[in-house]
């Protein structure tokens, strides 16, 4: 690495925290003249090394404001999470690969904050022992950085005694309690959780919400009362809720999404046992993702392709080599223990709630013996109703609209590869992302509008001359609000034949489903459909 390049590099580690078993951090890095192509985190311990993939290219407008001359400053953010094979990690190094192929190592060991949890409670050790022999092995990390500062870092700690003395009296005096488990990563699952809590409170039911908090590597317990008020506590483990489950009038356990939970297989085993120990508490398992089937909860394999849940022997060879960032949200594991323990959890549920029939079919591929009478299909309610339909001109050059927060699994690389082809082949096509794109793309044919409100959609479509929509997701989404909104705009849509969106668009007359999952196929389908629509608008 040349001396000037090292000297001119700018970076910041906003937070890097470890609890001994897990690492999480975020920051930014950029150079005045050279683009950074890839970032990784190298861990060194006593007799071991590990390379963690880093999600690089996140939007950082704060960095761009302070360092406007740095190349790609606005997309210089990174986030990383993962599990060291053993404790402790003595050295942590950021590995940077530049666009010219050069490589630079930055020692960031000094930035690590340690959050040692001390000895675990005897009850937790028992649960860990029951799962002995396992090697425990997750839209989207997008939004963690944005929300991290809003987290309640100073929430008081709550051990088992405190749970009884401080929390239980208020819960035990009420008529009913719903205990909800969910991740804290944002997105549709969290929106659904908020609606669920509001419904329960409106019915006079108190709610205890347990989430995992990545920025601090611990759990949060939030207690909501129907009369109002909210209390927030830190807990070292979900096992701290056992006194509440044992003594409070728990009528419902609602498993929304445990993606990112510290010990996912221990959690699955524990939930099944809690349901057996408390038969009056109804257990609902909501399938917002495919976490119960695989740590790659978006069902993309180690090569980044949709897998469709193949034979478990294929999964056994895929999972050990899977390097995706979302898989790193879970500890290393094997597919056998994963399916066995999550299968037990699903079997214990009174209701396995799917939001599309596509989800039900895929889940049954992983668990063909799951009782059919316990699986429900309840699509989400979509409130979006446009005030009017957008006016579009199909005789004008093709302008492709992409709506939403487009991460890699939602098709960011498809958009990037399409733009590469458009630029390389000098095609008269523009792409407008109404929302955000999670990968940096430099093209004069691209415009990214940034965040939007639903009531702005029609105006943004018209102002940008959009005349065709693309839904580029490369994973089988369990439900898609964006797809429903696109249909209500009555615009032509191109998408891949995957998941709930594929099922929904197959019955929509203005949709075209691509022959294969690739940028080339998407672009060809868009061009073909645009030509057909343009021909229909030509005067006879």
Please name every model-derived segment:
Residues 469-481, 502-503:
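Nucleotide-sugar-dependent
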Residues 1-170:
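Basic, ligand-binding patches in group-transfer machinery
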Residues 435-464, 513:
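Nucleotide-activated donor-binding/catalytic signature segment of Leloir-type glycosyltransferases, i.e.
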Residues 468-469, 492-495:
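Short hydrophobic beta-strand element within catalytic cores of glycosyltransferases
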Residues 344, 348, 360-382:
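Helix-loop-beta element that forms the nucleotide-linked donor phosphate-binding surface
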Residues 353, 393-410, 419:
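Conserved donor-binding/catalytic core segment of Leloir-type glycosyltransferases
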Residues 191-195, 407-421:
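A conserved mid-protein helix/loop that constitutes part of the nucleotide-sugar donor-binding site
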Residues 308-352:
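Membrane-proximal helix-turn-helix segments that form the acceptor-binding/catalytic region
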């Amino acid at each position: 690495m040349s001396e000037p390049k090292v000297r001119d590099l700018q970076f910041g580690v906003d937070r890097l925290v470890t609890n001994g078993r897990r690492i999480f951090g975020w920051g930014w890095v950029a150079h005045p003249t050279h683009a950074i192509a890839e970032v990784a985190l190298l861990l060194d311990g006593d007799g071991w090394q590990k390379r963690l993939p880093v999600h690089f290219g996140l939007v950082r407008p704060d960095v761009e404001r302070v360092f406007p001359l740095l190349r790609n400053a606005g997309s210089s953010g990174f986030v990383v999470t993962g599990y060291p094979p053993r404790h402790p990690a003595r050295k942590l190094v950021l590995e940077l690969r530049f666009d010219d192929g050069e490589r630079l190592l930055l020692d960031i060991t000094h930035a690590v904050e340690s959050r040692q949890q001390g000895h675990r409670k005897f009850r937790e050790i028992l649960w860990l022992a029951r799962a002995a022999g396992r090697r425990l092995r997750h839209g989207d990390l997008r939004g963690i950085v944005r929300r991290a500062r809003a987290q309640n870092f100073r929430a008081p700690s709550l051990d088992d005694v405190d749970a009884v003395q401080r929390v239980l009296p208020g819960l035990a005096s009420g008529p009913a309690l719903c205990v909800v488990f969910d991740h804290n990563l944002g997105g549709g699952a969290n929106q659904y959780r908020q609606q669920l809590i509001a419904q329960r409170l409106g019915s006079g039911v108190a709610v205890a919400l347990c989430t995992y908090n990545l920025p601090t590597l611990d759990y949060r317990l939030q207690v909501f009362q129907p009369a109002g008020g909210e209390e927030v506590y830190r807990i070292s483990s979900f096992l701290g809720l056992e006194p509440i489950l044992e003594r409070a009038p728990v009528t419902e356990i609602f498993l929304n999404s445990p993606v990112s939970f510290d010990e996912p297989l221990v959690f699955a085993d524990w939930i099944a046992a809690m349901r057996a120990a408390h038969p009056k508490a109804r257990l609902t398992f909501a399938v917002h993702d495919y976490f119960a089937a695989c740590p790659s909860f978006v069902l993309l394999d180690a090569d980044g392709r949709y897998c469709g849940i193949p034979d478990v022997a294929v999964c056994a060879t895929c999972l050990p080599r899977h390097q995706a960032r979302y898989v790193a949200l879970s500890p290393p594991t094997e597919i056998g223990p994963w399916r066995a323990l999550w299968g037990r959890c699903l079997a214990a549920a009174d209701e396995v709630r799917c939001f599309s029939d596509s989800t039900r079919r895929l889940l049954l591929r992983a668990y063909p013996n799951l009782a059919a009478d316990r699986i429900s299909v309840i699509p989400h309610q979509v409130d979006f109703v446009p005030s009017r339909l957008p006016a579009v001109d199909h005789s004008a050059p093709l302008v492709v609209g992409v709506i939403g927060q487009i991460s890699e699994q939602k098709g960011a690389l498809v958009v990037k590869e399409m733009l590469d082809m458009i630029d390389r082949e000098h095609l008269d096509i523009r792409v407008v992302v109404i929302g955000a794109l999670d990968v940096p793309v430099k093209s004069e044919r691209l415009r990214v509008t940034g965040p939007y409100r639903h009531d702005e959609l029609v105006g943004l479509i018209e102002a940008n001359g959009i005349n065709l929509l693309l839904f580029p997701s490369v994973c089988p989404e369990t439900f898609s609000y964006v797809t429903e909104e696109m249909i209500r705009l009555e615009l032509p849509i191109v998408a891949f034949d995957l998941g709930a969106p594929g099922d929904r668009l197959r019955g929509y007359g203005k949709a075209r489903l691509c022959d294969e999952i690739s940028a080339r196929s998407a672009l060809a389908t868009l061009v073909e459909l645009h030509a057909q629509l343009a021909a229909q608008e030509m005067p006879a």
